[in-house]
From Swiss-Prot:
Protein name: Putative ankyrin repeat protein FPV228
Keyword Repeat: yes
InterPro entries with a match to the protein in the record: Ankyrin_rpt (IPR002110), Ankyrin_rpt-contain_sf (IPR036770), PRANC_domain (IPR018272)
Cysteines engaged in disulfide bonds, as pairs: none
Superkingdom in the source lineage: Viruses
Entry keyword annotation includes Repeat: yes
Provenance organism: Fowlpox virus (strain NVSL) (FPV)
Length: 525
């Protein structure tokens, strides 16, 4: 008890900077040094916290162990690295250089006395780990210059580089990289490399800067963590970092344990800008992910018209089914999204597709759950397909759809109106071989441009309800084409071989060209 009391007395004397009492206690009370070294109230560590160089020298001169530790296993160098001696507000605002420079003589004193610069605390952290974490570049430089080991792992497998990256400490990162720290070591918890950590930094400028530093020092851009994900998976919140990874060889179609690629993740999180960037860099728009879902499937689940359009414009196949053979159209109709459903149908989604349970997109739900606008859109499409393609009526999905329609009065009434409108359109003759329904049923619309100003069309359209908007859309497109057609005809009729041909023949030739081809001819002539 007397020894313990004396140690506490010594500790108190150090804390109030009473050097006379310290010397007196050490000389007269015969306290065994080992007791002091292992006591929780360690006078040397207290002197370090107080940045009291003279007191530190005094204690060391009297034999206090230079590598003495606190209950957490921290030595004096650990405490210096953690900025224990800096007021909290100064650390918070980054104004602690003056305090750090005060410690340089103390640090040098410890190094002259052969302090263990690679000592590990209870978490297996060295002073280098903690200096990197607190961005104590002064201590970091001194430790590195004195051959501190840069690749020691803490109990979680983190190197000092992991700490510096998490702390967003760019200067510390540069220092460590200049001393050949291994940039590709992965920790034990998530198997994160420093690059995994860097791409998850919220600030895009800092993230890009750190990622660039790591990549310049041969960081593996495709290293995988415990979830089998590469750093690119964590860059979906920072487009600049994403581009940097892609420009340095990141595998854009790499998949995780659940088979999803980055484009699935971006679509699931409704990130239009990221999806567009991935597509611009060559991501597979039809990549099969978790449970057979494509990016379009996720976009449909998220009611995201904009993302769906982007994917479809880049060639997404709307008929790729998931693990139970549901296509995005099943989801769109289930969600009663009329705009999304229309876009899928216009892009070639198969309304007669049958899933593993023998259901089609409209039999998938109870008929009374499908809103009237969606029902009109879908049933009018089915009637259109039946009119255009005779073989459709033999398909199991079509037979199932017709059965659902006929067994539900509202659906059957819609079907009858659609069929009546087709009969009416066929009665509006435009030529010996063409009638108003040709604008909906004919896949080669270019040949119909010649009839576009026939007054019968505009008079008759007003009598049509369900297919009116479809007709107006087609006619508007053809009117624009006619303007382009007539412009090109005027430009080329007197050029080369064309001046020897009748205008009707030239016009027929132009009918076989696409709108894009006509536009190019108009530009270059």
């Amino acid at each position: 008890m007397l020894i313990m009391s004396s140690i506490k007395e010594l500790y108190h004397a150090v804390s109030i900077n009473d050097r006379f009492s310290v010397v007196n206690i050490l000389e007269k009370k015969n306290i065994p040094i080992d007791y002091i070294n292992f006591h929780p109230d360690n006078p040397l560590l207290e002197a370090v916290k107080l940045t009291n160089t003279d007191m530190i020298k005094t204690l060391l001169d009297y034999g206090i162990c230079i590598n003495t530790r606190d209950i957490l296993g921290n030595t004096a160098l650990h405490l210096i690295a953690m900025d224990y001696y800096v007021p909290h507000n100064d650390i918070k605002h980054g104004h602690h250089n003056d305090y750090v420079f005060k410690m340089v003589p103390i640090i040098n004193l410890f190094l002259r006395k052969k302090a263990n610069i690679n000592a590990c605390n209870n978490l297996n952290q060295t002073p280098l780990h903690l200096a990197a974490e607190s961005n104590n570049t002064t201590l970091l430089k001194i430790l590195l210059y004195n051959n501190a080991k840069v690749n020691i792992l803490d109990i979680y497998g983190n190197t000092c580089l992991h700490y510096a990256v998490r702390g967003r400490n760019i200067e510390s990162i540069k220092l460590l990289l200049s001393y050949n720290v291994d940039v590709n070591i992965r920790n034990f918890t998530y198997w994160y490399s420093a690059l995994h950590e860097a791409v998850q930094i919220g600030d895009s400028k800092i993230s890009r800067c750190i990622v660039s530093l790591l990549l310049c020092n041969k960081a593996n851009v495709n290293t995988r963590c415990r979830l089998n994900t590469t750093p690119i998976f964590y860059a979906i919140n920072c487009i600049d970092t994403l581009k940097l990874l892609l420009e340095n060889g990141a595998d854009i179609n790499a998949t995780s344990d659940n088979d999803n690629a980055v484009i699935h993740l971006a679509t699931e999180n409704r990130r239009y800008d990221i999806i567009k960037t991935l597509l611009d860099y060559g991501a597979d728009v039809n990549m099969i992910g978790y449970r057979g879902k494509t990016p379009l499937y996720y976009a449909t689940e998220n009611y995201s018209y904009r993302n769906m359009k982007l994917l479809l414009d880049h060639g997404s196949n709307p008929n790729i089914a998931d693990h139970i053979m549901n296509t995005p159209l099943f989801i769109s109709i289930k969600c009663t999204c009329i705009e999304n459903t229309k876009m899928l149908l216009d892009s070639g989604a198969d309304i007669n597709h049958v899933n593993d349970n023998g259901e089609t997109p409209i039999s998938y739900l109870a008929p009374n759950l499908i809103p009237t606008p969606v029902a009109i859109l879908v049933i009018s499409h089915i009637v259109l397909l039946k009119t255009k393609y005779n073989h459709i009526k033999y398909l199991p999905g079509f037979i199932k759809n017709i059965s659902v329609i006929q067994n539900f009065t509202k659906f059957n009434n819609i079907k009858k109106v659609c069929e009546d409108e087709f009969r009416f359109m066929r009665s509006v003759s435009l030529s010996a071989n063409h009638n108003l329904s040709s604008y909906i049923c004919n896949d080669n619309l270019h040949t119909l441009v010649r009839f576009i100003k026939n007054p019968k069309i505009y008079y008759s359209i007003n009598k049509i309800r369900i297919y009116r908007n479809r007709l107006y859309s087609i006619i508007e497109r053809l009117l624009n084409r006619k303007k382009l057609h007539d412009l090109v005809l005027e430009l080329i009729k007197d050029i080369g071989v064309f001046n020897k041909l009748p205008l009707d023949i030239i016009s027929m030739i132009l009918d076989f060209l696409s709108d894009d081809d006509l536009a190019l001819m108009a530009i270059f002539n």
